[in-house]
Amino acid sequence: MAVNVTGADLVILVPMLGRWDRLPRLLHSAFAATPEAQVWLLVSEDDASGRAHLDPARINDGRVVASLVDSRAGTSGDYARKINHGAAHSDRDWIFTGAIDLCFCSDWYAQAARVQHATGALVVGTNNLCNPRTAGTYRGSAHSTHSLFARSYVNERGTADVLGRIYHEGYVHEFVDDEAVRTARYRGVYAHAEHSRVEHLHPACGKEATDPVYRQQGRRIGLGRAEFDRRKHLWGGDG
């Protein structure tokens, strides 16, 4: 399955947790690069502030879709749960696991398409211009924090142990991407598109001011690492 560079086959999933001021930048770059893509904004049902930002004049217009996510699902993984919800309720052939603090470079999807066409990969990684692990080969293997997943892969393979999901919901946030990339690599269906640039405007690389959500990262990393280590036997122990 080859990707369509206009984005007619693409849904970009964006879990929301504040930072609504960054939405115009995200949408502008997404639609400039892929004018026929859909962007799904995934908001927890109990997020009153988030629901208040859903502008009926702009949301659910066919290109931008808002979807409310059950916040009582009983798992710790807010980001993973929202991504999995978006994957389950959308219908485009290719799913991009996004975030509000991204900026899409103009040829990102064309570059990802080139790699997918050449390799037949079902999961294609991108370069976030922030984390050096995403810039190509890093200590023997490339990583991707925000990736393209073929819907067929999600439906037929899923996570390391659950069909129909992109991310394991046992992570608070960090390491969801590590598990997904390593699982796809273990299955032989991952390719890295180092020239597919989706910039992560993150404080860790000096591209954004910190805020309370970012500051929680240090506390969460140890929890994520422990969960990753507990599960890594599922993808051959890589990591």
Where does each model-flagged region fall?
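Glycine-rich, basic loop-to-helix element that forms the pyrophosphate-binding segment
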Residues: 72-90
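Short beta-strand-to-loop acidic/aromatic patch adjacent to the donor-nucleotide binding site
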Residues: 92-103
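Short beta-strand-to-loop element that shapes/binds the nucleotide-sugar donor at the catalytic cleft/hinge
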Residues: 122-141
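C-terminal catalytic/acceptor-binding lobe
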Residues: 171-239
